[in-house]
Amino acid sequence: MDKGNRKKVGLLGGNFNPIHHAHLMMADQVAQQMNLDKVLLMPENIPPHVDEKETISAKHRVKMLELAIKENPRLGLELIEIERGGKSYSYDTLKLLTEANPDTDYYFIIGSDMVEYLPKWYKIDELLKLVTFIALRRKDTISKSPYPVTWLDAPLLPISSTMLREMFAKNIEPTYFLPQNVIDYIKTEKLYKKR
């Protein structure tokens, strides 16, 4: 296939528990800087590295993502890991995506803190044949990797989903940390309340 007709799609995987402005800014900046057709936010079903007890249902995480991205045409959703079920391994996901979309080049977006863990990723050598890694550089991390990684500079917000869950549990509204429509959804659904 002619390289010029290929789609360029970024993937930002995560638990998104909840989605926040740091996730959104990262996705949008990569879309713009790499001239991607779209960046798809891809919620994990059962992440292999996160304590399941801390993860709310996929239904709520997907709804929050839908609310968060609805105003940005550069962003979309990829629900393959939710639909597939089970543990979410990037290699398995990318194998399915590349087989289903042979006209698409995928760019997997990670924070620079994840680059050092690439050697521990499931089937990393095979994964590298399916995807280009894009890492956003942080001042406090080393921009080196034994694997091919495209490094981008973008402002990174010091926001974490853990911090936001703790704020909600203490009845502190994290205004400006995540979209207001997501805050409203969390409050309506009474998510992240202490039991």
UniProtKB/Swiss-Prot annotation:
The gene is nadD. Pathway: Cofactor biosynthesis; NAD(+) biosynthesis; deamido-NAD(+) from nicotinate D-ribonucleotide: step 1/1. InterPro entries: Cyt_trans-like (IPR004821), NadD/NMNAT (IPR005248), Rossmann-like_a/b/a_fold (IPR014729). Its EC number is 2.7.7.18. The keyword Plastid does not apply. It catalyses: nicotinate beta-D-ribonucleotide + ATP + H(+) = deamido-NAD(+) + diphosphate. Disulfide bonds: none annotated. The keyword Secreted does not apply. One of its GO terms (biological process) is NAD biosynthetic process. Pfam families: CTP_transf_like. Belongs to the NadD family. One of its GO terms (molecular function) is ATP binding. This is Probable nicotinate-nucleotide adenylyltransferase.
